From Swiss-Prot:
The gene is pdxY. Homodimer. This is Pyridoxal kinase PdxY. One of its GO terms (biological process) is pyridoxal 5'-phosphate salvage. Its cofactor is Mg(2+). One of its GO terms (molecular function) is ATP binding. It comes from the Bacteria. Pyridoxal kinase involved in the salvage pathway of pyridoxal 5'-phosphate (PLP). Catalyzes the phosphorylation of pyridoxal to PLP. Keywords: ATP-binding, Kinase, Magnesium, Nucleotide-binding, Transferase. Belongs to the pyridoxine kinase family. PdxY subfamily. GO terms for cellular component: cytosol.
Length: 291
């Protein structure tokens, strides 16, 4: 039994972190082995607050060792990481990736480098951004940053599409083979834009921007999980990009139609495997150079 090791946050109610990522990967045909970095009652934007706690780095190490004890790591096809609760957890991620790749060199490491958005109630602990930029992102096969996280990794401001391509160029030169920018907000106000960069080129996808009374949480986690599952199904990088873009829109559209705050992932589950709408992907003519 092959599986995906997903190490990120978890909420009991709603869809964020692992609660947003696990089911889409399962629905696309994969066993998922979740390890939670934090476990909260709900996501942190609720004005009533939340309950729960963060786990320690040793908790991650202990669970990974347990998987190793039953020879599961050699059957791990990918490690997907998202929100980390401490810099020490980032160290545990490094150990985990190294241990998995030692037993299965073909496994992929997909890093969703959550650096926090205080205005959205997402706050990361001190040292996490530095660990992501200096260690986790360079060792990843695939990174799935938003525009801000890409700018931190590339150490440059991103104000235009040309800037974004340059930042992707820098990112690819640092180690990752694929950069998927899950939200590129410098391009258009009335469309939601995503950018894919590989050594073969740069590609832009845009879909209608849906206006919510309260912006759903966990969209980035949904995108990274769909992209991971697509790659593991043997899709080309471009097809995996197309699929995750269109499938995510399908979930968001149903969420919007029902005027819900939490992602309607279960109700929209058919969108995860057969998106009802397909949007064009534009190959950019801007130069993308790799070292």
């Amino acid at each position: 039994m092959h599986g995906i090791l997903s190490i990120q946050s978890h909420v009991t109610y709603g869809h964020a972190g692992n609660s947003s990522a696990i089911f889409p990967m399962q629905r696309m045909g994969f066993e998922v082995w979740p390890i939670h970095t934090v476990q909260f009652s709900n996501h942190t934007q609720y004005k009533q607050g939340w309950t729960g706690r963060a786990f320690s780095a040793s908790d991650i190490d202990e669970l990974v060792q347990g998987l190793d004890n039953i020879d599961a790591l050699k059957r791990c096809k990918a490690i997907l990481t998202g929100y980390q609760g401490s810099a020490e957890q980032c160290e545990a991620i490094i150990r985990t990736v190294e241990k998995v790749k030692a037993q299965n060199p073909s496994s992929l490491y997909i890093c969703d480098p959550v650096m926090g958005a205080p205005d959205k109630g997402c706050i990361v602990a001190p040292g996490i951004t530095e660990y992501l930029v200096d260690h986790l992102m360079p060792m990843a096969d695939v990174i799935v940053p938003n525009q801000f996280e890409l700018s931190q990794f590339a150490q440059m401001e991103i104000n235009t599409l040309s800037d974004a391509v340059e930042a992707c160029n820098i990112a690819l030169a640092k180690g990752p083979k694929v950069v998927l920018v899950k939200h590129l907000y410098c391009v258009s106000d009335d469309k939601f834009s995503m950018l894919l960069a590989t050594p073969e080129g740069c590609f832009l996808a845009q879909r209608p921007h849906l206006t919510f009374a309260q912006q759903p949480v966990g969209v980035g986690d949904l995108i990274s999980s769909l992209f991971t599952a697509g790659l593991l199904k043997g899709y080309s990088t471009m097809r995996a990009f197309q699929h995750c873009h269109d499938a995510c829109y399908g979930v968001l559209k149903q969420t919007h139609q029902l005027n819900e705050w939490e992602l309607q992932t279960i109700l929209a589950q058919n969108e995860l495997v057969e998106p009802s709408e397909t949007f064009p992907i534009e190959r950019l003519n801007l130069n993308l150079k790799t070292a």
